Amino acid sequence: MKKSILSFCVLAAVVFSCNKKKDSQEETIKSDTITAEKQFSKADSLVNKAIVAHGGDLYNNADYSFVFRGKKYRFQNNGQNFEYSSEVQKNDSLIKDKISNATFERYINNKLQTLSKEDIGKFSEALNSVIYFATLPYKLQDVSVNKKFIEEITIKGKKYDVVGVTFSQEGGGKDFDDEFHYWINKQTHKIDYLAYNYRVNEGGVRFRSAFNTRVIDGVTFQDYINYEAALETPLKDLPKLYEQGKLKEVSQILTENVINNNK
């Protein structure tokens, strides 16, 4: 009888120890999860507020066209589905590019073209890039986007939250290793400045200042002055160089003749 009681006590102690260890492991996992959420939640929250300020849910079913550098563009969103297109006349050829979800097509004078894998990648990246910048910050909610809160700073007397963005290789496009910073106005929650570095064509660093901000049927569109900085300049140093007039203007990013096709 004593032997049975002793065996029961040993078994109970083992079970209690295992349960305690399991509870401890669960608490550790829970603590790690909360820590991870806290680490990224501020950046996510800032970007979500920026998306709302720039158009919010209106992006989900938006259908707008605009002109950029002489070429007509259009983006049509329908929930998770989308279609991006561009159209330009070159001599006797009308060239139309179209991305429908993950499929790229090029038409010349309404005839579908057979393209190499390299050309498909090049043309689709070019089209995606224009729509990406025209609809900022809408695409910053994509699953391939990795966001991180950097700091709070003041530029020309206005306060900003700075969010850093990188992209996962899967779903991040050809230039997934580019790095971006976005300066989000604390008062308006809109993106007044952005910067990025890139690796292709020997690399480079760019800083953009928004101007001509206008709201068209609830969606914000902006133009940008595009500045160049010395190679390897840290992105977080660019606002100070901008205020000091040490950045070189290289171009203007103009989104013109914006039309809401849903009207």
Give the location of each predicted region.
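Sec-dependent signal peptide recognition
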Residues: K2-F8
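Bacterial signal peptide processing site
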Residues: N19-K21
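Short, basic/low-complexity N-terminal boundary segments at the transition from targeting/disordered tails
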Residues: A43-I51, A126-A134, W183-Y198
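C-terminal motif of bacterial Sec signal peptides marking the signal peptidase cleavage site
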Residues: V14-S17
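Flexible, processing/modification-adjacent segments and terminal tails
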Residues: R106-F176, Y198-N201, I259-K263
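N-terminal mature ectodomain segment of secretory-pathway/periplasmic proteins
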Residues: S31-D32, K38-Q113
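Intrinsically disordered terminal and processing segments
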Residues: D44-S45, A53, D57, Q89-S93, ...
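Gly/Pro-enriched, hydrophobic low-complexity segments
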Residues: Y160-N260
